[in-house]
Amino acid sequence: MGDIENPWHSRPIDVHRWSDHPEVAGLCDRIWDGYLPSDQTSGPKPKTAFRHQLRVLVLDLYVAWLEDPELCIGVSMSSNYWDTTSRYNALHISKKIIPIIHALDHAGLLDLAKGSFSGPFVRGNRTTRIRASEVLRGWFAEVTFQRDDIGRATGEELIILRDTEEGLVEYDDTDQTIRMREELRRYNEVIAHAFIDIPVLDAPRVDDVAIDRYHERTRRIFSRSDWGMNGRFYGGWWQSLNSDWRSRIFINDTPVVEVDFRGLHVSLLSLEAGVELDGDPYEVSERLLGGVPTQLQRSLIKKLVLTAINAGSKDSAFKSLRDGFPTGHAGKTLTNEQLERLLAAFLERSPHLEDQLFKDQGIRLMNLDGQISEWVHRHFSDQGVPVLSVHDSYLIDYTRVGELKRVMAFASERVCGAALPTSNEFFGLDEVDPTAEHVQDYVTWRQTPRSEGYLQRLAEHERRIGRAVEPFTLT
């Protein structure tokens, strides 16, 4: 067994992996028969057979190994954690998984780092970490089943309610949660049938972000045990990329345009105060920090204001801002005095927001933008058209940008009482005269060389869905 040098390089166990592939069943039978006791035990029959619980565990270890051999899985070793009746446990994984993990560890099939607990809410607390050992990795390397042979359990919960400590909260369904779940299921179905990729990537990865269909499933998460807090949509890999990489995404082999709400949370707070924003709220006329370029200064002001909207106090906001920058970034060493100067310049332009900062407003405002996204998703899902949401912006293929902007205006008016301002760097083909000469130049310019890896992934997608992807062509 190897040592786990960095137990923080991990993700939580995914208890919704499943596969009926015969080789998967054979591998799990080999492990069970060789290292685990008979599943003929006394007591009530489990909702999910113990061998099936082993299969879920082995599949998640296999997926983690494929993504990164050093990646660990965080798993609770407390019997109280495993609730077979939970709505977040569709396969009814039970506390039996704990002795299964112990048996695999004893057999040398796992690398394991025990969890640590120093007291309630201590930052260093963590669950036990596991990953496939060299022995199990060797077995994984010999199998012929592939990532595509591993799916997800039917009935996996998409509407998540968390408490203040990010723990999962059980709830009873209402007409609202049933509607939200069905709409999100339809949205995920539209996304699953679309080919969403980046043509310049030969290998489907940007830094630590996997660009593939296995990281496209979206969930909706509410916070603080309150359906009025958060409610944003999370999950698509595009949410983890910066705007430059997002601009290179193609949907169904067609370039995209990203449309964003300008200063969304500032706009929402201004609307609530009865004030109409004039121009860019983050731009100030003078350079406030010596040696800092104007564009970087704007970026710092924007990050400071958004942090101040989310924070409960000025001290926590300033600390959080600095902590969010990497070593060497200009923002890392900003003093409180400099931050006060930036904040004062912002408030000089938007004095109506002074009483709205440092009041923990962000989580409430997220609920409003989540409702807006719900309207946007619904409109395009009804047409079978994929649209990618990034909380305050949306990406769509460049033939539907004007339509997207109209839907965003409609949605924000329904939710907030007024159409919020939007902006987009690139224009949509439905916003211009398609016969204009510059439009052909634009279409040509947006066409990106396709890498060999991209073309292979496109062909695999077409085989999987049983039809050809038809990109837009200007006639």
Give the positions of each predicted feature.
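Acidic, glycine-rich two-metal-ion catalytic cores of nucleic acid-processing enzymes
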Residues: G124-Q297, S393
